[in-house]
């Protein structure tokens, strides 16, 4: 059973998907929107799980053991419908909270979701050494940045 923490959980898309996939157990979540969090708690049994409202206040020392850190950090800073300021937008910098927690806890797996433009921003900061989420050389680990459109998921919307 792979234990995971659901960051920027919204109403629980990652949790629902991982639950349906099987072999995953959620041990905590983070969500700042009180209405989304209320829905999350109504949809899932979260009693006894770790919770923090604001990712910027997440203390890695208080987090339970987990192998997978997942999160769909806010996309407005990276989307064509939003500002597209990337990490220049305060919402875009929430990606760094995931990186901070990953650096501190070193989970076996990271699973992040966002719009395609975020790849460009992440690659830039990796190449300029502003942050390192790439695995160390000779570690045997690999980093994959994959881009899927809703068409890959058989949905008719274009995003």
Model-found features: residue ranges?
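Conserved active-site and SAM-binding loop architecture
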Residues: 1-159
């Amino acid at each position: 059973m792979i234990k995971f923490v659901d960051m920027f959980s919204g109403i629980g898309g990652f949790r629902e998907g991982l639950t349906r996939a099987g072999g995953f157990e959620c041990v905590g979540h983070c969500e700042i929107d009180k209405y989304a969090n209320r829905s999350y708690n109504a949809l899932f049994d979260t009693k006894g799980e770790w919770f923090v409202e604001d990712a910027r206040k997440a203390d890695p020392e208080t987090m339970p053991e987990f192998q997978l850190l997942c999160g769909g950090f806010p996309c407005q800073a990276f989307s064509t419908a939003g500002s597209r300021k990337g990490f220049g937008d305060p919402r875009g910098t929430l990606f760094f909270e995931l990186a901070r927690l990953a650096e501190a806890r070193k989970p076996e797996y990271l699973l992040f979701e966002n719009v395609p433009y975020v790849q460009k921003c992440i690659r830039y900061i990796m190449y300029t050494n502003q942050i390192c989420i790439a695995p160390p050389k000779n570690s045997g680990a690999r980093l994959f940045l994959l881009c899927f459109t809703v068409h890959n998921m058989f949905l008719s919307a274009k995003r």
